């Protein structure tokens, strides 16, 4: 056992560090990129549009997160955006929020690794690999167990993922855990986080454990309630902008709230006024992740005046785009919407 621990420690030596957006003023570089070509020009235009979302004080900004972003070092970018009131709603995969951000709030880390490795050896040592990044599987099990503990502490019933993630924020506060966390900062700021596929991550393991041992009275996650709550935000704040990192469920879920509002009788609801997506997916296979924002306009989801696709990897493009908007400082004077308070005051009944 001691030999195994030493072998494992040999792999888990250098932690991933999170880059922020407040330190380096990237505005001059991004503005010069506007006169280049290809994805440099697209990135610059995307940065201008994200900045327009900050200038437009009527616009509620929705940030969507897909892909392995927090483990890759983007946590501080998102925390900086939350801290400076640049984001009003987050829609994410469960992995980013639970397996990665909440995991780090528990005191654990992600580690620099290599894609050129014997994966069978990693398996023997209980090390999980995300391309060139390592995670301690034994620590992930602690995260799973913590989700079960939180569920066990709640009144049985159906909750939106947003409501459950608020409880995760409370847990961080009550247990004196690391508050440099997306979950905690959003909890503190009243910014709702939705994970429409919440069970597809460590939350799923924790919740299935909770329900298995509490078959008659237990907590469950109502994804339709997620959809209704997010649609209610669109109805209450008609002008919206979406900054999408990756695609997947968070992208489609967020685009669909325009159509959902129409289905509920709000026929004059506006399409998303502003839209930016960073992706490496291809539009030619017809899948959602690479579908263009112009395509989304045919579905009545996204206006085409201020939209931009950036075909780039998120760890490169997101800090530049978010950093540009931060250093333009048009977020100053944006109203704090605190949609959590709005949803809790006017609950969407399960």
From Swiss-Prot:
Keywords, sorted A to Z: Transferase
InterPro entries for the chain: Deoxyhypusine_synthase, Deoxyhypusine_synthase-like, Deoxyhypusine_synthase_sf, DHS-like_NAD/FAD-binding_dom
Gene Ontology CC: one annotated term: cytoplasm
Domain of life: Bacteria
Organism the protein comes from: Chlorobaculum tepidum (strain ATCC 49652 / DSM 12025 / NBRC 103806 / TLS) (Chlorobium tepidum)
Enzyme Commission number(s) of this protein: 2.5.-.-
Family to which this protein belongs: Belongs to the deoxyhypusine synthase family.
Protein's UniProt name: Deoxyhypusine synthase-like protein
Enzyme class: transferase
GO molecular function: deoxyhypusine synthase activity
PANTHER family noted in UniProt: DEOXYHYPUSINE SYNTHASE, DEOXYHYPUSINE SYNTHASE-LIKE PROTEIN
């Amino acid at each position: 056992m001691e030999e195994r621990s030493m072998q494992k420690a040999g792999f888990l030596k250098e932690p991933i560090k999170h880059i922020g957006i407040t330190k380096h003023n990237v505005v001059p570089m991004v503005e010069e990129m506007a006169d280049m070509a290809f994805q440099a020009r697209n990135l610059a235009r995307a940065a201008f549009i994200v900045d327009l979302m900050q200038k437009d004080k009527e616009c509620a900004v929705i940030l969507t997160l897909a892909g392995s972003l927090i483990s890759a070092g983007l946590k501080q970018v998102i925390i900086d955006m939350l801290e400076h009131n640049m984001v009003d709603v987050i829609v994410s995969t469960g992995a980013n929020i639970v397996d990665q951000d909440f995991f780090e709030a528990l005191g654990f880390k992600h580690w620099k690794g290599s894609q050129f490795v014997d994966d069978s050896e990693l398996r023997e040592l209980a090390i999980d690999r995300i391309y060139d990044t390592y995670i301690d599987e034994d620590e992930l099990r602690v995260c799973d167990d913590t989700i079960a503990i939180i569920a066990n502490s709640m009144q049985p019933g159906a909750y939106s993922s947003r409501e459950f993630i608020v409880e995760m924020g409370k847990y961080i506060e009550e247990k004196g855990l690391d508050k440099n966390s997306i979950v905690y900062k959003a909890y503190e700021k009243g910014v709702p986080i939705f994970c429409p596929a919440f069970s597809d991550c460590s939350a799923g393991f924790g919740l299935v454990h909770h329900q298995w041992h509490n078959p008659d009275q237990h907590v469950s996650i109502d994804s339709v309630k997620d959809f209704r709550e997010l649609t209610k935000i669109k109805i209450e704040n008609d002008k919206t902008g979406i900054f999408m990192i990756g695609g997947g469920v968070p992208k489609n879920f967020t685009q669909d709230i325009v159509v959902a509002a129409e289905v509920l009788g709000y026929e004059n609801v506006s399409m998303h006024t502003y839209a930016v997506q960073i992706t490496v997916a291809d539009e030619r296979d017809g899948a959602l992740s690479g579908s263009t924002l112009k395509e989304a306009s045919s579905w009545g989801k996204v206006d085409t005046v201020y939209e931009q696709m950036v075909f780039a990897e998120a760890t490169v493009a997101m800090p530049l785009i978010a950093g540009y908007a931060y250093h333009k400082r048009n977020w100053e004077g944006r109203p704090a919407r605190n949609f959590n308070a709005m949803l809790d005051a006017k609950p969407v009944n399960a």
